[in-house]
């Protein structure tokens, strides 16, 4: 049985392209309908959606990075106007209040993030080098390091007080890594 199931990734189904292109989706009957339970519009994320407010899919901007804790319990009343994500995504779950406040959570089926305080303060060495395979599920902190544009063109008036990285060596490298 496993041989039959394991080989399916090589096959493409005729409807996959239609789903990807959102074919067969009609326009909303009127503007302003609550779409908080709908999927995110693939075309909007690429800047290509022409349906505007009549699109049946959500037009979420990048700021919706954390799942709405009220939506998880079915209590969010803001709908499309909520600043948080209305989609169940384990990689974007909010932090557990009880675990962060008391260091323990008694709910064995808690879906919120349980982040150990020791890991909150440690930067991820892999992210600092450029890529972390664990992504948002990483137990370490991901702090973006941005090169100073003034330094790149020759001179930064802020000098060592500049908040941006000014030398390649300011990016933390793992032992044995080369630039």
From Swiss-Prot:
State the GO CC annotations.
mRNA cleavage and polyadenylation specificity factor complex
**Family to which this protein belongs:** Belongs to the CPSF4/YTH1 family.
The protein's matches in Pfam families, at most eight in alphabetical order, are given as: zf-CCCH_2 (PF14608), zf-CCCH_3 (PF15663)
| GO MF term list | RNA binding; zinc ion binding
Q: Which InterPro entries match?
A: CPSF4/Yth1, Znf-CCCH_3, Znf_CCCH, Znf_CCCH_sf
**PANTHER family with a match to the protein in the record:** CLEAVAGE AND POLYADENYLATION SPECIFICITY FACTOR SUBUNIT 4-LIKE PROTEIN-RELATED (PTHR23102:SF19), CLEAVAGE AND POLYADENYLATION SPECIFICITY FACTOR SUBUNIT 4-RELATED (PTHR23102)
Alphabetically sorted, this entry's keywords are:
Metal-binding, Repeat, RNA-binding, Zinc, Zinc-finger
Name of protein: Putative cleavage and polyadenylation specificity factor subunit 4-like protein
Xref: SUPFAM superfamilies? CCCH zinc finger
Q: Where are the zinc fingers (C3H1-type)?
A: 35-61, 62-89, 90-117, 118-145, 146-169
């Amino acid at each position: 049985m496993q041989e039959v199931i394991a080989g399916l990734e090589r096959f493409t189904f005729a409807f996959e392209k239609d789903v990807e292109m959102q074919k067969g989706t009609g326009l909303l009957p009127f503007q302003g309908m609550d779409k908080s339970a709908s999927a995110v519009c693939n075309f909007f994320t690429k800047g290509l959606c022409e349906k505007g407010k009549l699109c049946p899919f959500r037009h979420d901007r990048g700021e919706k990075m954390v799942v709405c804790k009220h939506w998880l319990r079915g209590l969010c009343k803001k709908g499309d106007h909520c600043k948080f994500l209305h989609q169940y995504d384990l990689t974007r779950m909010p932090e557990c209040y009880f675990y962060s406040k008391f260091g323990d959570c008694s709910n064995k089926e808690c879906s919120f993030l349980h982040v150990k305080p020791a890991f909150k303060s440690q930067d991820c060495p892999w992210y600092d080098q450029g890529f972390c395979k664990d992504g948002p599920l990483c137990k370490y902190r991901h702090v973006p390091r941005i090169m100073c544009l003034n330094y790149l063109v020759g001179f930064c008036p802020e000098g060592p007080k500049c908040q941006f990285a000014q030398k390649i060596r300011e990016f933390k490298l793992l032992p044995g890594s080369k630039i």
